[in-house]
């Protein structure tokens, strides 16, 4: 196949040399148009190599970040998501902040119907922290889904 397929013109990172940022960089996130907007479906990202810094001690924190969402018009491009998550490597934030920041940045990028983000952080001092946050588009059935998922998440 030659040329750029329809919808891929929106993306700038695929096929180009990867430059890793050393600072928190939400601007690296890219979105493309969902070709199946008439369907409800789940997209899941498992990100097992997430790293951030404790804002107090400067020690590294490690986690698997899980992102589930139901797209609307836009979807996040996976390489840009990888670079975005990598940008937390030298960013100081508590575990709870990390998952909320990630969710809010993805909402700003895509305006999904529904999204949830949770982090399974490696134990520190014998305690693991597993923060969860979610969002459903206001005034829609996805808002009700968010409420139900929050009530049943464990």
UniProtKB/Swiss-Prot annotation:
Q: What is its main location?
A: cytoplasm
Q: Does Kinase appear among the keywords?
A: no
Location comes to: Cytoplasm
In the Enzyme Commission scheme, what number(s) does this protein have? 1.7.1.13
What are the GO MF terms of this UniProt record? Answer: preQ1 synthase activity
Per the Swiss-Prot or TrEMBL record, the active site comprises 54 (thioimide intermediate), 61 (proton donor)
Please write the reaction equations for the catalytic activity of this protein: 7-aminomethyl-7-carbaguanine + 2 NADP(+) = 7-cyano-7-deazaguanine + 2 NADPH + 3 H(+)
Q: Which domain of life is it from?
A: Bacteria
Q: Which GO terms describe its biological process?
A: queuosine biosynthetic process; tRNA modification
Pathway the protein takes part in: tRNA modification; tRNA-queuosine biosynthesis
Mention any one GO cellular component term assigned to this protein in its UniProt record. Answer: cytoplasm
Pfam families, per the entry: QueF (PF14489)
Keywords per UniProt: Cytoplasm, NADP, Oxidoreductase, Queuosine biosynthesis
Q: Where along this sequence does the record place binding of substrate?
A: 76-78, 95-96
Q: What does this protein do?
A: Catalyzes the NADPH-dependent reduction of 7-cyano-7-deazaguanine (preQ0) to 7-aminomethyl-7-deazaguanine (preQ1).
The protein's matches in NCBIfam families, at most eight in alphabetical order, are given as: QueF-II
Return the PANTHER family for the record.
NADPH-DEPENDENT 7-CYANO-7-DEAZAGUANINE REDUCTASE
Q: Say which family it is in.
A: Belongs to the GTP cyclohydrolase I family. QueF type 1 subfamily.
What is the protein named?
NADPH-dependent 7-cyano-7-deazaguanine reductase
Q: Which organism is it from?
A: Porphyromonas gingivalis (strain ATCC BAA-308 / W83)
Gene label: queF
